[in-house]
């Protein structure tokens, strides 16, 4: 069948890659597994053999021909014909996720998943995206994505996947990543909405020092630039001058959390 290019369809065909993904998730007979993207069902079938139930979310009804074949043999598979970004994932009751994600929704679906209660997610990403997700501070790949994901989860690189594992072959390499939810973040965050805006402000200027980056992108935390500059030069935040003087990409995860919480308190106090 003809793949839907608008949906970024590249169907997984390599059974060895399927096996690696399932092994990384440590699937057992008690698991309820969420899969995003049906494809031709190669991953779905293997999951169904090993777990209690598979819940598949698929947008493209043209793939129904593969679904009809699957349900005849595996009655423990349920499908939701919808856009995964529009489905209330929290209502589905899964404890694990294994999926070959459409790459154009990699970022929004990852953060949507991180808001859910699950044990582990094993996901296929574009290789460069996977590198940024697990990057440590001080590296060129360290980004807003790195910070936002690693605050909420442990990221483990499973393996690189070549274009030959898919049909049609994508123009980029891929990678399987294992995401394990943390019981507690590295540093308790007072306000997650502010934290996300704070990170956007920082990493829009990752090579600048932290104070300049925040001032340049004050709008990301709903601040007037001059007002934020005044606060960042005030005595109240003086004890964090060393952090404010560091280049953004050198800040550790904990340093970002500490600075974020204290700036949040100072801003609220000034209102």
Swiss-Prot record:
Similarity field: Belongs to the class I-like SAM-binding methyltransferase superfamily. rRNA adenine N(6)-methyltransferase family. RsmA subfamily.
Record's function text: Specifically dimethylates two adjacent adenosines in the loop of a conserved hairpin near the 3'-end of 16S rRNA in the 30S particle. May play a critical role in biogenesis of 30S subunits.
Residues annotated as binding S-adenosyl-L-methionine: 12, 37, 58, 83, 100
EC class name: transferase
Pfam families: RrnaAD
UniProt-listed SUPFAM superfamilies: S-adenosyl-L-methionine-dependent methyltransferases
Protein name: Probable ribosomal RNA small subunit methyltransferase A
InterPro entries, per the entry: KsgA/Erm, rRNA_Ade_diMease-like_C, rRNA_Ade_Mease_Trfase_CS, rRNA_Ade_methylase_Trfase_N, rRNA_adenine_dimethylase, SAM-dependent_MTases_sf
Alphabetical keyword list: Cytoplasm, Methyltransferase, RNA-binding, rRNA processing, S-adenosyl-L-methionine, Transferase
HAMAP family for this protein: 16SrRNA_methyltr_A (MF_00607)
GO molecular function, one term: rRNA (adenine-N6,N6-)-dimethyltransferase activity
EC nos: 2.1.1.-
Gene: rsmA
Gene3D superfamilies: Ribosomal RNA adenine dimethylase-like, domain 2 (1.10.8.100), Vaccinia Virus protein VP39 (3.40.50.150)
GO cellular component, one term: cytoplasm
Subcellular location: Cytoplasm
Disulfide bonds: none
